Regions:
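DPxDG-like acidic metal-binding loop motif
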Residues: 100-124, 155
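Short pre-catalytic strand/loop immediately N-terminal to key active-site residues, enriched for Gly-Thr
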Residues: 93-98, 274
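Flexible, acidic active-site loops/lids enriched in D/E/S/T/G that coordinate Mg2+ and/or position polar
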Residues: 66, 79-94
Length: 330
């Protein structure tokens, strides 16, 4: 039996510049972190030749091509496993529409577990690259590359997407004391709305060339935020950058926010939040807000109608947490 654990992520700034329509023209960049909420992939060898898949549905098929779960199907094809396995996926949060990158975390976790099932160790770069190939090139999802890379590498990272299709991943060298402060000053509230990111990203992708100036401004915010995080001064300027980033992001598509989300955001700011953003593509999922410690009780009281979702920053990417492997055969 193999179990992989792959973290979910929070994207702070730069989202949208990881779409090919942007980075094929000029380099894109994001600043993201992984958090202590995960997706798990469990792979168990079966005596028979059937394929058993357990998620929100249960599938039992005798041919890989008959699998409806496209991420599992393509990950198995990519890794060369065709039969005789049972695969179960579990998640700490709603598996679709959370805005925390769960689909890409599942893809990365599947690849990691399937390779481990064969006794193979692969790099974070390979996991990220192959997850992008599956989700973007093969399945044609209108998404960017940031989720796959942050899930594979983990930690607090600046990720740059270059026109030559290379990707550069750098650690943000934040002091430990500030890292604790930065992490503890962020609150996450569930909007109680889930949505398919593709519904928003299709429109955003179509508008990319018309929104290049806004996207470039969002990319510049990556460097501003990194500069603040790596400075010696622990300050709350990060909240203002998140506020500015959210104002930019809303200009990319009318679907990114809604009257309900705007009201929720304003409630948090009125109670003391310095800034924030809806996670992922927008439209629902989770609202991230930056709140100084002394204002957090007031913000939680103002947001009492929404579920508070405590989290911590996680320095690790996808990893194998259990490996009891018998001899594998095809």
């Amino acid at each position: 039996m193999i179990i992989s654990q792959t973290p979910l992520r929070i994207s702070f700034v730069g989202g949208g510049t990881d779409l090919k329509d942007y980075w094929s023209v000029k380099p894109g960049a994001v600043l993201s972190t992984t958090i202590d909420k995960y997706v798990y992939v469990i792979i168990k060898e079966r005596f028979d030749d059937y394929i058993y898949i357990n998620y929100t549905q249960k599938e039992i098929v005798n041919k890989l091509s008959n699998l409806k779960h496209d991420l599992v199907r393509e990950a198995m094809l990519k890794t060369g496993i065709e039969r005789g396995v049972e695969i179960t996926t579990l998640a700490d949060i709603p598996s679709e529409g959370s805005g925390l990158g769960s689909s890409s975390s599942i893809t990365v976790g599947l690849l990691n577990a399937l390779y481990a099932f064969q006794g193979r160790q692969v790099t974070a770069e390979q996991l990220a690259q192959e997850a992008c190939e599956i989700e973007i090139d093969i399945l044609g999802n209108p998404i960017g590359k940031q989720d796959q890379y942050i899930a594979a590498y983990g930690g607090l990272r600046e990720i740059t997407f270059n026109p030559d299709e290379t990707v550069t991943v750098e650690s943000v060298k934040i002091q430990n004391a500030y890292k604790r402060s930065f992490g503890s000053n962020m609150l996450l509230f569930y909007t109680d709305v889930t949505r398919k990111s593709s519904d928003i990203l299709v429109e955003q992708k179509a508008n990319t060339r018309d929104k290049m100036d806004i996207l470039t401004q969002m990319k510049d915010q990556v460097h501003l935020l990194r500069e603040i995080l790596e400075s010696d001064d622990c300050c709350d300027e990060a909240g203002q950058i998140l506020y500015d980033a959210w104002q930019c992001k809303k200009k990319l598509s009318e679907k990114i926010s809604s009257p309900a989300i705007d009201k929720m955001y304003q409630q948090a700011c009125d109670a003391g939040a310095l800034g924030g953003k809806i996670s992922g593509a927008g439209g629902g999922g989770f609202l991230l807000v930056y709140v100084p410690r002394e204002k957090q009780n007031a913000v939680r009281a103002a947001m009492k109608d929404y579920r508070d979702f405590p989290f911590m920053l996680d320095p690790d990417g996808s990893k194998i947490i259990f490996n009891m492997r018998r001899a594998y055969w095809k």
